[in-house]
């Protein structure tokens, strides 16, 4: 994969972030209209044909969309500004003090100084497996997190390559881009889960209250619409996640002038990337290699369309030819 300049990659990711911020409200609006149309179609007896159905749909959409957009906006603001603590809790990470490991601080500081970057925060996951990730949306929240295993089992050159990989994510602004996509997908996931659980509860109480039939239909329609949104938003998120790994590998090779060290690190990481605390798929894609069992099977079917990471063998091969 051809590597592009830092400024070009930053500009591209800033543009993509802007496009996501524009496309997401549009997707929400389209899905809201679809929900209104389906609801009118299945619940209202229309004696005046398609025109009246569309008129009623338009009126319901106009009445409903301000509340939908308002709720989504509140969710986005909360998730956007609390993402660091959410990710830390989801991965079991904690701050790594300088006195605990001066070696790591020296490696990070030297790389940051060579690139003119501000020093990020450093966290550690107390897990013997090998993995790492970058997170944050600005200089105040940028963080590099390393597992205990990756610190102990990689030599300095390999660890420098991994750190450079994560610093490239930060420098290229693709950490922020990915977090925005994660927040968006999370909204659809939450709506689908709420609708699914509500349908289950309503169907369970149906025998006691036949009036629940209409409510169940509404919830089923909401679940279908939310699932459609989740599907397309997830595809977009996965595509962003896969490409960013190639770019970060190339950036790390350029930063350290030692692509073979990162290739060696990836080989060791691929042998044991599983982080026990990580259960959420959206958080898993932040890591240098998928930290769960899907690391071995994510590429099966549809040519890896639903994979969060590209094949690590391909990444290693590219680095060896860099």
Curated annotation (Swiss-Prot):
HAMAP family: Pept_M48_protease_HtpX
Family: Belongs to the peptidase M48B family.
Name of the molecule in the record: Protease HtpX homolog
Main location: membrane
Record's keyword terms, sorted: Cell inner membrane, Cell membrane, Hydrolase, Membrane, Metal-binding, Metalloprotease, Protease, Transmembrane, Transmembrane helix, Zinc
Cell location: Cell inner membrane
GO terms for MF: metalloendopeptidase activity; zinc ion binding
EC annotation from Swiss-Prot or TrEMBL: 3.4.24.-
Residues engaged in binding Zn(2+): 165, 169, 245
Membrane-spanning residues: 19-39, 61-81, 175-195, 216-236
GO annotation, biological process: proteolysis
One cellular-component annotation, GO: plasma membrane
Cofactor(s) this protein cannot do without: Zn(2+)
Membrane-topology annotation of the record: Multi-pass membrane protein
Cofactor binding note of this UniProt entry: Binds 1 zinc ion per subunit.
Active site: 166
């Amino acid at each position: 994969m051809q590597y592009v300049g830092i400024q070009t990659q930053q500009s591209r990711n800033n543009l993509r972030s802007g496009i996501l911020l524009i496309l997401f409200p549009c997707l929400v609006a389209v899905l809201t209209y679809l929900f209104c149309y389906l609801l009118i179609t299945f619940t209202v007896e229309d004696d005046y044909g398609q025109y009246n159905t569309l008129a009623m749909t338009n009126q319901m959409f106009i009445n409903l969309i301000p509340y939908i957009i308002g709720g989504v906006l509140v969710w986005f603001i909360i998730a956007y500004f609390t993402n660091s603590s959410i990710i830390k809790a989801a991965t079991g990470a904690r701050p790594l003090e300088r006195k605990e490991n001066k070696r790591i601080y020296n490696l990070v500081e030297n790389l940051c100084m060579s690139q003119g970057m501000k020093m990020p925060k450093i966290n550690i996951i107390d897990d013997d497996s090998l993995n790492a990730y970058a997170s944050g949306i600005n200089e105040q929240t940028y963080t590099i997190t390393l597992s205990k295993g990756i610190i102990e089992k990689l030599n300095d050159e390999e660890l420098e390559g991994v750190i450079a990989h994560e610093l490239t994510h930060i420098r290229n602004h693709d950490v922020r881009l990915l977090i925005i996509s994660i927040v968006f997908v999370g909204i659809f996931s939450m709506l689908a889960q709420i609708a699914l659980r509500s349908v289950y509860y309503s169907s369970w109480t149906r025998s006691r209250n036949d009036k629940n039939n209409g409510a169940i239909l509404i919830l089923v329609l909401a679940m279908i619409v939310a699932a459609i949104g989740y599907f397309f938003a997830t595809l977009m998120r996965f595509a962003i996640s896969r490409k960013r790994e190639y770019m970060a590998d190339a950036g790390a090779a350029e930063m350290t002038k030692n692509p073979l060290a990162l290739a060696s690190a990836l080989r060791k990481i691929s042998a044991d990337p599983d982080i026990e605390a990580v259960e959420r798929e959206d958080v898993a894609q932040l890591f240098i290699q998928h930290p769960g069992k899907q690391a071995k099977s994510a590429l099966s079917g549809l040519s890896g369309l639903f994979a969060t990471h590209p094949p690590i063998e391909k990444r290693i091969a590219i680095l060896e030819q860099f």
